[in-house]
Structure formats: structure tokens, C-alpha cells
Amino acid sequence: MSYAGNRDQQFNRSNFGGRDGDHRGQRPSDRNSYGRDGFGRGGRGGFAGRGRGRSDDRLELTKPDWDVESLPKFEKNFYVEHEDVQKMSTDEVEQFRKENEMKIVGHDVPKPIRTFDEAGFPEYVLKEVKEEGFEKPTAIQCQGWPMALSGRDMIGVAATGSGKTLSYCLPGIVHINAQPLLSPGDGPVVLVLAPTRELAVQIQKECSKFGRSSRIRNTCVYGGVPKSQQIRDLQRGVEILIATPGRLIDMLEIGKTNLKRVTYLVLDEADRMLDMGFEPQIRKIVDQIRPDRQTLMWSATWPKEVQQLARDYLHDPIQVNIGSLELAASHTITQLVEVVSDFDKRDRLVKHLEIASKDKDSKIIIFASTKRTCDEITSYLRQDGWPALAIHGDKQQQERDWVLNEFRTGRSPIMVATDVAARGIDVKGINFVINYDMPGNIEDYVHRIGRTGRAGATGTAISFFTEANKTLGAQLISIMREAKQEIPQDLLVYDRAPRGGFHPRYGGRGGRGGRGGRGGRGYGGYGGGYGGYGGGYGGGHGGYGGKPKDSGWGNRN
């Protein structure tokens, strides 16, 4: 079997080697080990009141009675239309939008720009962009930048990996530099809400990269780690705050920050935040922000729940949709679906890893439905000599960061993940996504495979479809047809509408996570059953890149 877009190299499982020995840096076995030692966080599954008692000194977050007229005035319209954009005729604008699959909603929408120079950014912003080596703006940036710089409330609907982060990050930097400097005790000027810590960290990296010339300070606030460093950052003062909703509410309730200075609010991956149950927290947070702020909402899909949130909190917004509003997969991704039994999955997985390993630079994400399965797959692969690491919600943040860094740098080019852990991960060069377990709904399928084929690159998504996934059959086939993918004959037997009660986007979610939180039980975990990395894997299997024999990635015989 071969995959479209591969580099015409022959099978060579040792291609993943050549990494000069054990690239774990002789780390002790507590890294990514599964003898939990008491730090598993079972029972904290809720987002809103995570099982902690409220202390008496916590503030009660109530909606202020805003008097907009008495609030300090602020500037939010910075857009100066470039002369080349001014010259664009109505027909030229319509043709450009058609070519880039843009659909516009609202009145007085600025014309799209076509180059970085046309965007109207100050020179200090433009310099940062050009130094990154980008050739031209993405479609969402071409229309999103003029909309955001004009100070209007706006909605951007575009697929994951389309460049949404820079669409709001760069205008946010311009916005900050036009506001008065922070005084002691002031909260941020720009607030970005994101569904997961991984996405929040990724956003922070972009803000740091493009805000350095202006010396704009930022911090990232999320759960799963101690509050102390986050509190210190907030108390020193930051212009940009990137946060997950739950931890931000914690910080507001204990008085470590406030949102009185926020005039630029971003809701990133709004559909994900609502899907994860964050709507009450979002509403509580937004109520703490002055109503005449500029609000930007970004989403990969446009379900009715997101539409309602936009109606409640955005004023006279303008909207750009890139591509179809129907759920769709990127056309740069080759989708391969195999109808298999659960018994066949492991053999099929190894076969695909052998194919992928002919490119020594490949990065592969394997999705599993539960934390336990995630651990079991990783254990199986590592025993077989594959350099795999796992990431899921039971892991401490320090451990997750280490795993991501090993994956990002290619030292461990296989990462086994659950949906929640992988949300927001933006790693360049992911060639393959393997759905070892199909997700519970079609939206998560599209989101998973969107880890590859980003920003115009090509990628391959392989999915193991079993009889247990039959309720997804019709929707999966529809997604594949829209992307002009070849549909296997044994999948076509599932091409029928799901039976009653199955919502086309959200049905079937109730079964997810049933076995979550059991990682390490019943099979000893890595640290217990197999002696940890330094013992069982480092000694018995040669670690990542060393022995057995001359193995690197996969020469395991």
C-alpha cells in the first residue's frame, strides 16, 4: 500500500533511526510513566466547580451595572485602506472572494487585502511578519485583518490550521499600542479565551513572537498546574492574557486579576468551548468586560449554540466564512478508512507505521478513545521498538509539555493521544493521523484528521472502522464524498441514515469517556509492569534510537 503525496522512498523501518542513541536525555522513569504515584486526577471531570470548596475570601462574580458613558474612551478603528485595495472594483472583490471560498455576512464589510503590505499594519508589525518568511496571507487573514483592524465586532469561521491565530493576534497588538500604558493593579487589555491549555500555550507563543518588538507582555493561565507563577505574572501586569475559562474564573474570584481594562476580547475555537461545557463560564467572564469592547469570535464550525452566543455578546458583527459552513474535511488530506475488527487493529497499526517510517521526518498522531487504551497502545508499541509517547488528561502539565516537545522536535515522532489532550496542538509537519479508535461523533473525526494537511500541506488520515462505529457510517461517507475521497466497498454498507435520536453533529457523544481515568489499572502501567523507561524500556528495548540491534525507529528484528 502507498499513500498519495509520499516521497517515493522504499520501505525502510530504520529510517526513523539515526538519532544517536537514547534521545530521552537519560531522563528518569518518572517521565511519561504510568505508575501514577497519586497524581491521577480522577473525579475532576467537571469544568465548573471542580470539587473544591469556596473559601470565604473569594469574590462573587456578578454582572456589573455598566454605564458606558462614564467609562474611559478608547480607540479601536485603526484600518487605513491601502491604495491598491481602494482601486479594487466590486467585480474584482467578488472574484477574489469566490476564488478563496469566502462568504461575507453583514454591512459595510471592508474589502479583502491580497498582500501583507496591503493590510495596513504598522511597520513594526509588518517587519515581524516578513521575518517569519510567510509568502502571502491565508484566506481568513485576507478578509479577517481589515475586519479586525476596523474595530468592528466580527466572526470568523474557518477550518483548523487556516491561520486564525494571526488573524486576531496582529490586530490585537496594534490595538494595545494605541491604548494608555497599564497602571499598577490594571488587568489586561486583550483577553483571549481558549478551550484547552495546549491551544492557550500555542496562542501565547504566537503573541510572544509578534509582540516582542513592542515589548508587549503576556501570560497564559490554565488549569492543571500550580497557580503561583501565573499569579506572579498577573500581578506584574500583562497586556495580553490567554486563558482557559475555568482557571480565569479562579483568578478573578481570588482577586488576582480583573477585566476592567479589557477592550479587545477574543473567543477562539468557540464551538469547542461550548462543546466542552464552558458556556456558563464564558458568559460569566464576558459579563465582567465593558460592553463597548471589540469582540472577535473564531470557530471551525457554526452550530446554533455558537450562533446564539454571538447574538448575545457581539454588536452588529460582520462575518467571514471560509469554505462551506457544512462540516467538511480539508481537501489536502488523503482519507483512508479500513473496516476491521478490534482484534485486527494492532497488526494494521504496525503495518501503517512501517509504511510511514520510510520518511524519517514523519510525525504521526495516533488517536485512542480512552486514556487506558492510549497507555496500552503506547506500551505495546514501545515493547515492539517504536518511539512512541502518550499524552492524555491524567498527565501532569510538566509531563505533557515534555511529551509535546519530544514530538515537536522529532525525538519521539509517534504520539498517542486522546481527543481532549490533542485539542489545540499545533505541530508543524504532522504527516499522518491514525484513528485507532473512531471518535464518538463526526465533528471530532474532522477535528482529529485536521492535525495533518494544515496550511495547504498534504497529509494522510487512516481510520479503523468497526461494527461498533456503524452510527458514524453515513456521516463519514458524506465527509469523504465531499472531499472527493475513495470510499471502500465494505464501508458503503453503512451508508444509511442513523436511527432515531442521533443528531447529525452531536449525537453519540454520551458514550465517550466511559473508561477514562482508569489509566494504569489492571495492567501495571509502564512504571510498574514494565520497569519504567530507564529499566524496562531503556535497558530491555534500547530506548528511542539505540539497540536492539541497529534499530532506530523500527528495525526491531
From Swiss-Prot:
GO cellular component labels: cytoplasm; nucleus; ribonucleoprotein complex
Positions occupied by motif DEAD box: 268-271
PROSITE patterns assigned: DEAD_ATP_HELICASE, HELICASE_ATP_BIND_1, HELICASE_CTER, Q_MOTIF
Catalysed reaction equations from the record: ATP + H2O = ADP + phosphate + H(+)
InterPro entries from the UniProt entry: DEAD/DEAH_box_helicase_dom, Helicase_ATP-bd, Helicase_C-like, P-loop_NTPase, RNA-helicase_DEAD-box_CS, RNA_helicase_DEAD_Q_motif
Entry keyword annotation includes ATP-binding: yes
UniProt key word ATP-binding: yes
Annotated ranges, domain Helicase C-terminal: 348-495
Coiled-coil spans in chain: none
GO terms assigned for molecular function: ATP binding; ATP hydrolysis activity; G-quadruplex DNA binding; G-quadruplex RNA binding; mRNA binding; RNA helicase activity; snoRNA binding
Keyword set, alphabetical order: ATP-binding, Cytoplasm, Helicase, Hydrolase, Nonsense-mediated mRNA decay, Nucleotide-binding, Nucleus, Ribosome biogenesis, RNA-binding, rRNA processing
Source species, domain of life: Eukaryota
Region entry Disordered, spans: 1-58
Binding-site positions, ATP: 158-165
GO terms classed as biological process: alternative mRNA splicing, via spliceosome; nuclear polyadenylation-dependent mRNA catabolic process; nuclear-transcribed mRNA catabolic process, nonsense-mediated decay; rRNA processing; termination of RNA polymerase II transcription
Sequence ranges assigned to domain Helicase ATP-binding in this UniProt record: 145-320
Motif (Q motif): 114-142
Region feature RNA-binding RGG-box, mapped onto this chain: 506-532
Entry's localization field: Cytoplasm; Nucleus
Record text on subunit structure and interactions: Associates with polysomes.
Free-text note regarding domains: The Q motif is unique to and characteristic of the DEAD box family of RNA helicases and controls ATP binding and hydrolysis.
Function field: ATP-dependent RNA helicase involved nonsense-mediated mRNA decay and ribosome biogenesis through rRNA processing.
Family to which this protein belongs: Belongs to the DEAD box helicase family. DDX5/DBP2 subfamily.
PANTHER family given in the database record: ATP-DEPENDENT RNA HELICASE DBP3
Protein name in UniProt: ATP-dependent RNA helicase DBP2
Organism: Eremothecium gossypii (strain ATCC 10895 / CBS 109.51 / FGSC 9923 / NRRL Y-1056) (Yeast)
Gene: DBP2
